[in-house]
Amino acid sequence: MKKIFNIFVVSFTLVFSSSLFANKIGVIYDSGGKFDKSFNELAYNTAERVKNELGWDLIEFEAANNTQIEQGMRKVADRGATLVVAMGFAQADAVAAIAPQYPNINFVAVDVCWVDDPAGNIYQAC
């Protein structure tokens, strides 16, 4: 759990340093939902801290199955997220497909380190 927390700290530091004017965080939860007592719940708690301590808006998406991830990621981006956090390696393909379509949005792909990044807007935390 400590390793996952460290990944978040590093990821958010990288993103904050290049997106000083960002004000909406979007979180796409992996299977298990945001209260899974593990990976997703850490993402939820971190996003809540960003919301409460930095004043950012929070946009969330919980897919019922993996086929909804890309659609949900697009919805979060279309709702104005300036930072999208994709939780888990199952979301790698969706990040790779969606991020180039939104070059002004930063994406953090947690537990992913093999995605091509032609737009330069994917931070891979693995």
Regions found by a protein language model. Give the residues of each.
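Short beta-strand elements at the ligand-binding edges of bilobed clamshell
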Residues: 116-126
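Sec/Tat signal peptide C-region and signal peptidase I cleavage site
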Residues: 16-22
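Bacterial N-terminal signal peptides that target proteins for export
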Residues: 1-9
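Hydrophobic alpha-helical
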Residues: 87-101
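Short glycine-enriched loops at secondary-structure junctions
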Residues: 64, 111-114
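Short, well-structured alpha-helical segments in soluble
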Residues: 67-80
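Extracytoplasmic "Venus flytrap"
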Residues: 25-50, 59-66, 89-91
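Periplasmic-binding protein-like
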Residues: 81-89, 106-110
